[in-house]
Amino acid sequence: MRTVYICSPYRAKDGAELDRHIEYAQALTKQAIEAGLAPITPHLYMTQCLNEDKPQERAAGMAAGLALLEKCDFVIAGVKYGISEGMSREIQTADALGIEVVNADKLRYYMECKERQRQAAIKRYAHFHACDFCKGRHFHTCALFYCKESCRQAYEYAETHFTSG
């Protein structure tokens, strides 16, 4: 399962806006889970024990969040309500680390593209393990069992070991 970092606004001018931001972060987290991902949404839980209004605690929370971001496969950016200062820092960090940042509105399309890429890589890997006669052909044409069997085994191996992305 791929690990993703959820990036969305948290700071707010008033309680209603804060509630909206929290609900949005929760919805993004649910969307990621439903997509088969393991989301990390630090601003939902770090703010439960750290005071966002105290600069030292905010800095400690941001540092901890960025350390978690480094371990993620990609970042989902929820930009529906704009990009906050904290989000900007998270996105810049992801870019500097070479971690992809995906717009939350495009997550489904992104996941479909990654799955197509994974399937193509699996197929290439399996065909690479075919016999010399069949390499590069769409179908196995030599009718030799060991060629088809080795290709099938390579395909099954690749299917369990290749991740999308």
Give the predicted meaning of each segment:
Residues 1-118:
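Catalytic phosphate/metal-binding cores of nucleic-acid and nucleotide-processing enzymes, i.e., regions
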Residues 116-119, 136-138, 143, 164-165:
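Positively charged N-terminal leader segments that act as targeting/secretion signals
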Residues 119-125:
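Short, intrinsically disordered terminal segments enriched in charged and Pro/Gly residues
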Residues 125, 129-157:
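Cysteine-cluster motifs in flexible loop/terminal segments that predominantly coordinate metals
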Residues 156-165:
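Short, charged early-sequence alpha-helical segments and their helix-coil boundaries
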